[in-house]
Amino acid sequence: MRLPPENLDGFSFLLLGKNCKISLVSGTRISYDAERGILFLPEKNARERLVKWLKEIAKRILSELTDEKAREMGTAYKSVSATSAKTRWGSCSGDNAIRYSFRLLYAPKEVVEYVVVHELAHTRHKDHSARFWREVEKYVPDWRARRKWLKDNGILMEIF
């Protein structure tokens, strides 16, 4: 991944591990053609609108995935939000409010699932003890490879 140019038209980035190309358009509506991998983005305030859209999409996708994984794990959480965090992919507060960086959307879905399971494991274990990692491993047996992907590629995910 490369840093985006000032003019975003034609810029490509990964969205859940799939190529997404920006096409600047006149008008006011953002639309995404998932089949073709094209994000139609209004020219006016394009960068700001893109980040807002990414946060909204991240909250929706990550809320759905967190619900699904929480049911699978038999655990509960208070809420889900998407932030602009650049130093943490996710966090779980003492009252089980979960926050994710919207930049997780740039990672493959399997990596996102690891972060979701990691944060949900914190609803039971508020540390990174052996019990915590056993909980993660129960639901994501290859968590080490997924965590390594984040460590190896995290810097590439700071495009917006």
Segments and roles (model prediction):
Residues 1-113, 123-160:
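Active-site-proximal or metal-binding-adjacent scaffold patches in catalytic folds
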